[in-house]
Amino acid sequence: MAGQLRFTSGKDEDHFQHQGAVELLAFNFLLILTILTIWLFKNHRFRFLHETGGAMVYGLIMGLILRYATAPTDIDSGTVYNCGNLFFSPSTLLVNITDQVYEYKYQREINQHNISPHQGNAILEKMTFDPEIFFNVLLPPIIFHAGYSLKKRHFFQNLGSILTYAFLGTAISCVVIGLIMYGFVKAMVHAGQLKSGDFHFTDCLFFGSLMSATDPVTVLAIFHELHVDPDLYTLLFGESVLNDAVAIVLTYSISIYSPKENPNAFDTAAFFQSVGNFLGIFAGSFAMGSAYAVVTALLTKFTKLREFPMLETGLFFLLSWSAFLSAEAAGLTGIVAVLFCGVTQAHYTYNNLSSDSKLRTKQLFEFMNFLAENVIFCYMGLALFTFQNHIFNALFILGAFLAIFVARACNIYPLSFLLNLGRKQKIPWNFQHMMMFSGLRGAIAFALAIRNTESQPKQMMFTTTLLLVFFTVWVFGGGTTPMLTWLQIRVGVDLDESLKEEPSSQQEANKLDKNMTKTESAQLFRMWYGFDHKYLKPILTHSGPPLTTTLPAWCGPVSRLLTSPQAYGEQLKEDDVECIVNQDELAMNYQEQSPSPSSPTTKLALDQKSSGQTPGKENIYEGDLGLGGYDLKLEQTRGQPQMD
């Protein structure tokens, strides 16, 4: 080499830094506009366009400006140079250009399907996010918030129905969408719009699995504002929470389906292997998330972290995030892990937190959920113009619109009919119609679709998914209020006051004896509640009966070690607190908080507001497995007075 080389890590570091600041500033202004629009909508009670729909509109406008108002800044970026001395693709490459060495990093392999038509336009390329950002940064707070804010009482009273819709309903939707789309793909091949072999049945099932992920965030927000019938709200919310987890694992299982001989043919062994992968990944992710929540509960119970609310909140956040990262590192699904981590944290850990930490964790995850959700919907609008490999096919888009409506109908109506055969409180027709109408697509479907856009079928799926999200959020989300009126669904119902008065213990005993043969199917459910009340809550929280009264005498040292001192003082009452996150509650807590946050008065007020009821009134006996909704009764704990 003739002269001394000058090493540099980039073309113009200052230029790149300024460009990055401009891109972040653009997103910052989008979020500011979205927040102001939300305030305007709430102030004028405008419900025909939800905040997520407004965020997409602003994203569309910004994408339109970036697409047509910016020009390529590097005309040589699309030029291909041959390197005959390289026989593999290194992760980093040092290139000598006129005695200056530049460092380049590997991004992806370029082929005829993923080459960018806007090569050299640095702004458009930078505004196209790495898909992993959605899964590793934006989705976890949304999913954790869904689990942490779960309305436990209503959720478990409809648990059987929710599980049926979430698991069986998602599988039905996946298969129906896959079959309909396969028919349209064959029509596209016959019409000459696709080559035979470009789009296989497994691709159609993959599209069906990602489009099975419903995200009725718009509808649920309006339901919450109008205080819609709690049973309808719980069915729809519970289905959407678990449906996301099922759809993500189902999509992964289909993507790794690989028969040995023909990768696109049906193979029995490969099919059952995929089913096993689905069950294994789901169970492993569930165990991982629950384990981290149990560790958090034990740490908050047996340490004095509650005396330092900032440390307590920080530990709570980091351990919850670790559940997601550990599941991903272990080859499981972090989204499922963080969902069940949130549910378990709300059920156990929340009771151990100080009053300050209870309020802080609620606010923290509600804020993160709000911000992440609006970033995703803003980016959806942006991606319509900044994504560089869209494939618009009218026949495929038409088939997708038809498929999601047919699949939703095949999901809701048959399963509701079967559930009503066993439910004591039937799911009425107007509820079923509203659930059919509420099958919106949103953040999960978008994130699953954008994660892989390397091939032509995947690019066509992504473009179609984007259009479906726009249509369902704008049209169905905007039509929620008129649909509630047309279906005559009651509104203005308080979620807690709507619960029927609990029957007395004698009435429960008589009813249980009378219907003993009918409630045998709920034996597992009743056993779980008994185990949770007698053993898990006393071990993991400060509530529940002392373990000295529930464990055998020979376990005395262990029971005394694990029993919280507060449990002896509160032995006569049930001190389980439901974790309910909503904006009204947070506002009330701020207004009514005393000058001393750690005072007993403040703690009691916060606990009562967050639970929406007095301690000891949680209905731990009731549950519906979709097989009758009969009341459940726990046996009286030895050494403990009969609970009201």
From Swiss-Prot:
Induction entry: Down-regulated upon bacterial infection in macrophages.
Record topological domains on the Lumenal side: 1-20, 67-126, 186-203, 257-277, 328-333, 386, 451-465
GO cellular component: early endosome membrane; early phagosome; late endosome membrane; phagocytic vesicle membrane; plasma membrane; recycling endosome membrane
Quaternary structure annotation from Swiss-Prot or TrEMBL: Homodimer; phosphatidylinositol-4,5-bisphosphate (PIP2) and phosphatidylinositol 3,4,5-trisphosphate (PIP3) could be involved in the dimer stabilization. Interacts (via the C-terminus) with RACK1. Interacts with CHP1.
Topology in membrane: Multi-pass membrane protein
UniProt-recorded name of the protein: Sodium/hydrogen exchanger 9
Organism: Mus musculus
One GO-annotated biological process of the protein: sodium ion transmembrane transport
Principal location listed in the UniProt entry: membrane
Gene3D superfamilies: 6.10.140.1330
Cytoplasmic-side positions: 42-45, 148-164, 225-235, 299-309, 351-364, 408-429, 487-644
Tissue expression summary: Expressed in the brain. Highly expressed in immune cells, specifically macrophages.
Annotated transmembrane regions: 21-41, 46-66, 127-147, 165-185, 204-224, 236-256, 278-298, 310-327, 334-350, 365-385, 387-407, 430-450, 466-486
Keyword annotations of the record: Antiport, Cell membrane, Cytoplasmic vesicle, Endosome, Ion transport, Membrane, Sodium, Sodium transport, Transmembrane, Transmembrane helix, Transport
Transmembrane helix is among the record's keywords: yes
Phenotype of the disrupted gene, per the record: Deficient mice do not show obvious changes in gross hippocampal morphology or impairments in locomotion, anxiety, smell, or pain sensitivity, however they display autism-like traits, such as reduced ultrasonic vocalization (number of calls and duration), decreased preference for social novelty, and display an increased time self-grooming. Nervous system-specific conditional knockout mice show abnormal social and olfactive behavior, abnormal CNS synaptic transmission, impaired synaptic vesicle exocytosis, impaired presynaptic calcium entry, and decreased synaptic vesicle pH.
Molecular functions (GO terms): potassium:proton antiporter activity; sodium:proton antiporter activity
Protein purpose: Endosomal Na(+), K(+)/H(+) antiporter. Mediates the electroneutral exchange of endosomal luminal H(+) for a cytosolic Na(+) or K(+). By facilitating proton efflux, SLC9A9 counteracts the acidity generated by vacuolar (V)-ATPase, thereby limiting luminal acidification. Regulates organellar pH and consequently, endosome maturation and endocytic trafficking of plasma membrane receptors and neurotransporters. Promotes the recycling of transferrin receptors back to the cell surface to facilitate additional iron uptake in the brain.
Stated family: Belongs to the monovalent cation:proton antiporter 1 (CPA1) transporter (TC 2.A.36) family.
Annotated PANTHER family: SODIUM/HYDROGEN EXCHANGER (PTHR10110), SODIUM_HYDROGEN EXCHANGER 9 (PTHR10110:SF61)
Reactions this protein catalyses: Na(+)(in) + H(+)(out) = Na(+)(out) + H(+)(in); K(+)(in) + H(+)(out) = K(+)(out) + H(+)(in)
Cellular localisation: Late endosome membrane; Cell membrane; Early endosome membrane; Recycling endosome membrane
Entries under Pfam families matching the protein: Na_H_Exchanger
Source lineage: Eukaryota, Metazoa, Chordata, Craniata, Vertebrata
Renumbered residue ranges of the record's region Disordered: 590-644
